[in-house]
Amino acid sequence: MSEKQVALYIAVSLDGYIADENGSVEWLESIDSEGDAGYEAFFDNVDTVVMGRTTYQQIFSLTDTFPYSKKDVYVFSNTKAGTKDEYANFVAGTVDTWLNNIDGEKIWLVGGAKLVQQFLKEKAIDRFVITIAPIVLGNGIPLFEEDREHALELEEVTRFGQFAQLTYKNLEEN
């Protein structure tokens, strides 16, 4: 079996927020982009999708069709752990334990911020693909809350219309 790879693929405002103070990401739709900012190519390369419960619930308010139905989907949730629904398996516990118990090898960490912090604390993110939107929100839900440093190496910078996508490799080992 090859080594599992976890990628955080996410959009942020220029000031580092992944959502506004109400948890909405509608501000992303108002910005001109060039194509899908590499999303389809990224998505085609993952076999597993993981997110927090709030992010999972928000998806259903944004679309009528669940966009990840062809992938293995896991949702971290303390209240629903051990259950599943039509689209996802609900899990709890440590990231490391979860990673050791899944078959997937190319994993997309969708978010939200709390789950990102958990993955960061366990040094479980291998690659950061951060797409920066040309907007300053002023406040909202920050991508990073932890005050600990993380050593990263810039691998690529790509422009998609008004968006800048930065890809970093995590230099810290789990």
Please report, for each region that a protein language model flagged, where it lies by residue.
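Enzymes that bind and transform nitrogen-containing heteroaromatic metabolites
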Residues: 1-174
